Amino acid sequence: MGDERMKKRNGFTLIELLAVIIVLAIIALIAMPIIFNVIENAKIKAMENSTYGVIDAVRMQYMEELLNDEDGTLTLEGDVDELTLSGEHPNGGTWEIVNAADVTTGRGIKVTDVTFASMAGYKCNNDLTTGKVTCAK
């Protein structure tokens, strides 16, 4: 009679359920840092793209002033509201034209310590040799 009750068992024991929960917790502990790293890298790439947008906007404003027969001096005085930007607007940093001959490629425009509200503590800079923008803490 005792053997019949053991054969009709349809559920899981508490130990089996705890084992599954422990395995899932271990998988979650391994996966969480990877997921957070992917999210952080995506935000950094978005900041870099927004910085490229600042460079393009400065380039376009500079070219527009040249076409309007102005002296080629672009003075923004830290205010980006004059620029038509794609992406997030920066809330700090400097951008200057250091080589007018390379403005058309964007490599004549130096950006230094550009910051964005979405990623506090990060600053973006560009390398005039390669034209690449990097953002870091």
Feature annotation, model-predicted:
Residues 8-35:
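N-terminal single-pass transmembrane signal-anchor helix
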Residues 32-47:
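Sec-dependent signal peptide cleavage junction
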Residues 43-69:
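Membrane-proximal N-terminal amphipathic helix
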Residues 60-137:
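Periplasmic/extracellular, small/polar-rich flexible segments of pilin-like filament-forming proteins
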Residues 1-5:
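Short, Lys/Arg-enriched N-terminal segments with co-localized hydrophobic residues
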